[in-house]
Amino acid sequence: MDLKELYSLRNNFTIIGLTGRTGSGCSKIAEILSNDYHSFEKEGLRDVNEFNNIIFKRKYSICKKYLENGDNWVKFVVIKYVDVLLFFILNKYGGDYAKIKELLLDNYKESRSESNHRIVSSVMKEIKAIDYEYTETINEIKSFDHFKDIKDESELRRLDAVFFGENYYNLKKKLFEVLNNGGYFRTRLLLHWTSCNIRSTGDPLLTEKPNIKNIYTIANLINRLIKAKRIVNGSKPTKIVIDSIRNSLELMFFKERYSAFYMLATKDIIGNTRERIDGRLCETLTDSSERERIVLKVLDLDATEYRTKDFSKGIFSSPDLENCIQKSDYHIFNLKKDDLPEFIRKYCNNDANGFYTREEQLLKLLSLIQLPGIITPNSIERAMQIANTAKLNSGCVSRKVGAVITEKYVNICQ
């Protein structure tokens, strides 16, 4: 019997959900996963001969040889949360200028008190021009009734063709370009409040009469897109990466539905967050002081989404990044190959033996997903497994905490 058959389910279908603080690298991880193996290897994998620890060298070599062999590497299809959000808005209000203007007046502002009539009028002119250019695509999006009820194979194929098609790609690109030109932080807040409204009321505009039944509205649409992609791919492997999930109930939605779902949290390890956000603003803002002001506002919003107390008040529609990160299955730090020497010197006592770059960490994760047990866990991972078991068995209702005490060689103290 061919051993490939034993792992065929893992090889043929995988969903990775991404989460992390703003600027931590979720979009970059999604981009890396969507590339071919050659790009993946070139960008962040070190040569095996750069390691001097025989055991680690063997583990690294096994993972590398496995993924580069045959068709073990399959490019992931990226489902961007913001693209799904825009798709939902267009389905609801596409072509309805009065509703779109109302949505922008309510949410496209840097603060609730800001008067944004002038900038909304300017943005609406450009939106109308885009709407005229892509009327047919918008009408196709509006032709879908209730996304949750799309189960017919022909309708799922049509959903896949529209969402992943070139026309919608160009449409969303132009719309976000217009919105970002009007203000990057305004766009962030528009997406923030609109997603909260949809999870609360099922409508981008409504804020009153929240209903917990609407909490999975966006997740249900993503779920339909996943099913559509599986049908279109047929017998070919389907690999999906969701960029990114910021509500822990949506996270649990996918965990409970798919055994092949893995939640991955990213972390900025060397303090490049500000620099990354500033880099996104350079194209539209030349004034450095204005960029700094926007960066601070974006980081403040990120802190709000991370430390939110809304869940304790029974408001489940808000983003709660802290819970998302805590409930993640796998944690990686966003470390480029160029930053490796500084990281090794600062954190690893000049020991270069380890899966350190983001590509190397993904190399290990994907190998283990597709072939569990391909390499054995290291001492830190074994200790963390015990700590996690202690956490799961914690008697504390409010905080599930687990820990293990080791000596310097990570041997567990008795």
Model segments located where?
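Glycine-rich phosphate-binding loop of ATP-dependent small-molecule kinases
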Residues: 1-243, 247-275, 281-395, 403-413
